[in-house]
Amino acid sequence: MPSKNLQQAVLTNEFTTNFITTCKDWLDVNGLAKGNLEKKRDDNEEEERLKTESKLPGHDIHGFDNEIKSLQHFLLDQKVRREFKSLVIVGEYGVGKTALCQKIFNDEAVKSVYAPRVWVSMENKESKEGLDGKICVLKKILKGLGVEELILETISTDAKQEFKDNEEVASNQEAGEIDRETEKEKELSALLYALHLNLRWKKYLIVFDDVRENDNWDEKLDAKLKEDEKWGKYLSDGFPKGSGGRVIYTTRDENLAKNLVAQKHEIHRLWPLSDHQSVWKIYDAVVKDKQKESPRNDKKCIDELMNKSRGLPLAARLLAERDPVFVDDEVGPVGSTHGQTDSSNRQPANQASS
């Protein structure tokens, strides 16, 4: 008859094997496996984007203490309190960019210093061709500042009318005097002017979450107007300088990040978590929140969770959505299958882009 130690070793091995299989299945289902993420980057495929909000994520954030302190310093540094500053947070899907920004956006010290604060989810189902993308984002900011839809419609109508009037009188003007601005350019200029007025003399904080190349939001906001250029042509015209305004972007695109800021130190790269315990805490918190019993947290399981999630907080949370895997000598929740997980119960989790 096998010894008790041998039986326990066999059970532990079965548990670890089941845990590994569970992890792999969930990563494949939710597109978080390393190969799937690399394919997304290679194919540049545009999966459906979800709208994000400024409210706290609803769960504790583990492993980002240094990143939180860095963002607090960026926003609360008194030495540059009147300068306009921008920062880009770059990282892969599921690494926690959105959750990190939600955390700092709702920080009490930040809230006491910045007003207004505007959260802009770059998710948008409208046209983004030409200037449409920029116009759509500007309207989102203005709505976040309390500007009514009627005023935005009036701006659009006035721009169309001005363009039409210019076309009618163009034939009576000399070539050098013709206003060659398009209808969209006039609307963009008017929206930038409205934004400038709403932000002037204010210490504002604006977060642009999940910026992508096809959004056409790809200009440096700290650029200064040149003497020979007309005001209202560039996005930077809408963001007043000298009152301590701050802008934070999140993106997965390293090349786009370089177009959004002037200096390399203004790009903050967010890497997957390297702390095994932080990843386990994320996983365990979801399991407990679902009122399930946590699987054993021995070193093998923690290491396997780290290996399969690759340190991505979203992957750890998704893995926890499954029924925990139990070995025969552990007591699982009522209705659970000891030592295995029924694949027929697999339910996709609600994912929040980050």
From Swiss-Prot:
Region (Disordered), start-end ranges: 328-354
Q: Which Pfam families match?
A: NB-ARC
* BP GO annotations: defense response
Where does the source fall among the domains of life? Answer: Eukaryota
Residue ranges annotated for the NB-ARC domain, each copy included:
45-122
Where ATP binds, per the record, is at: G91, E92, Y93, G94, V95, G96, K97, T98
GO: which molecular function terms? ADP binding; ATP binding
Q: Give the SUPFAM superfamilies listed for this entry.
A: P-loop containing nucleoside triphosphate hydrolases (SSF52540)
Gene3D superfamilies reported in the protein's UniProt record: P-loop containing nucleotide triphosphate hydrolases
Q: Which UniProt keywords apply?
A: ATP-binding, Coiled coil, Nucleotide-binding, Plant defense
Q: Which InterPro entries match?
A: NB-ARC (IPR002182), P-loop_NTPase (IPR027417)
Q: Biased-composition ranges for Polar residues? A: 337-354
Q: Coiled coil: which residue ranges? A: 33-53
What PANTHER family does the record tag this protein with?
Answer: DISEASE RESISTANCE PROTEIN RGA4 (PTHR36766:SF70), PLANT BROAD-SPECTRUM MILDEW RESISTANCE PROTEIN RPW8 (PTHR36766)
Q: Function, please?
A: Possible disease resistance protein.
Task: Please identify the protein, giving its name as recorded.
Answer: Probable disease resistance protein At5g45490
